[in-house]
Design a protein with these regions (language model features):
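A short beta-strand-turn-helix
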Residues: 93-110
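C-terminal low-complexity, charged extensions that often adopt amphipathic alpha-helices
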Residues: 83-94, 133-135
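Structural alpha/beta surface segment adjacent to cysteine/selenocysteine redox centers
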Residues: 111-119, 123-186, 202, 206-207, ...
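Sec-dependent signal peptide recognition
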Residues: 1-8
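Surface-exposed patches in mature extracellular/periplasmic domains of secreted proteins
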Residues: 38-43, 104, 143-146, 174-175, ...
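N-terminal cap/recognition module
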Residues: 63-79
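C-terminal cap of thioredoxin/glutaredoxin-like
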Residues: 19, 28-30, 37-38, 46-68, ...
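N-terminal signal peptide c-region/cleavage motif recognized by signal peptidases
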Residues: 13-18
Length: 242
């Protein structure tokens, strides 16, 4: 029996199977062993589905009789390609679409990235300080709240107050600069919103902030700060692969 990873996930108010193309029988079988899937697609291996859930990534046979976890690699001559990373990116896209992100839209949008951020993170502050340069290169940024200190911290509460602001982009910019936080206390709805975003970071297996992924075009995952030119080059490279 597969036991779910102990992640406290507040479920979003959407159908659990909004993006899952599995038969009712297979859904029932994987639910019975604790896999609450919300995105699935055919894997590169015939007869096997890739399933993304709050428990992580699993692979399920088309009849639901066998389940395994881990990375699925494709052999390319002397090299191997981790197809699981690409699938995780797709699953995360599906999840992030339902989150309350703070968006800074590029005037001439070519790419969209989701960035897990913490208002106390120096590299996050650096990225935000250079925000205009990302936007000028056609990169729209959607910020996802991720308190490195956890949800039972003042940082999480402060970030919730930003997400509760009437003008969220302005409030986030002010917080990133250290110029203060919104006066009003965060509501439960705002705390829940930040909780959902924090859970997404745990599902993404964050090693630090800023980290994230492309939300438009071919999948691209990044960890750590990339300056505007590096980010643009990474996105271009990802979109030239196929």
């Amino acid at each position: 029996m597969i036991k779910p990873i102990a992640v406290a996930l507040t479920l979003l108010s959407v159908s659990a199977y909004a993006d899952v193309n599995l038969s009712a029988d297979v859904k029932a079988k994987i639910e019975a062993v604790g896999i609450d899937a919300f995105y699935a697609e055919k894997s590169p291996v015939e007869g096997i589905y890739s399933v993304f859930s709050k428990e992580g990534t699993s692979y399920v046979t088309s009849d639901g009789e066998y389940i395994f976890t881990g990375n699925l690699f494709k052999v390319k001559g002397a090299e191997v390609e981790n197809t699981t990373d690409e699938f995780i990116s797709k699953g995360m896209r599906s999840y992030i679409e339902k989150l309350d992100t703070i968006t800074y839209k590029a005037p001439d949008e070519k790419y969209v990235i989701g960035v897990f951020t913490d208002i106390t993170c120096g590299f996050c502050q650096k990225l935000h300080n250079d925000l205009q340069f990302y936007l000028e290169k056609g990169i729209t940024i959607k910020y996802i709240a991720y308190s490195r200190a956890g949800m039972n911290s003042m940082v999480a509460r402060n970030m919730a107050s930003v997400w509760c602001a009437d003008d969220k982009p302005a409030a986030l910019t002010k917080a990133m600069k250290g110029d203060g936080l919104p006066d009003k206390q965060p509501t439960k709805a705002c705390m829940d919103s930040v909780q959902n975003q924090f859970n997404a970071g745990n599902m993404f297996k964050l090693s630090g902030t800023p980290s994230g992924l492309s939300l438009k075009g071919e999948p691209m995952v990044f960890a750590g700060l990339r300056d505007p030119d590096q980010m643009l080059n990474s996105l271009k490279t990802a979109n030239q692969k196929k």
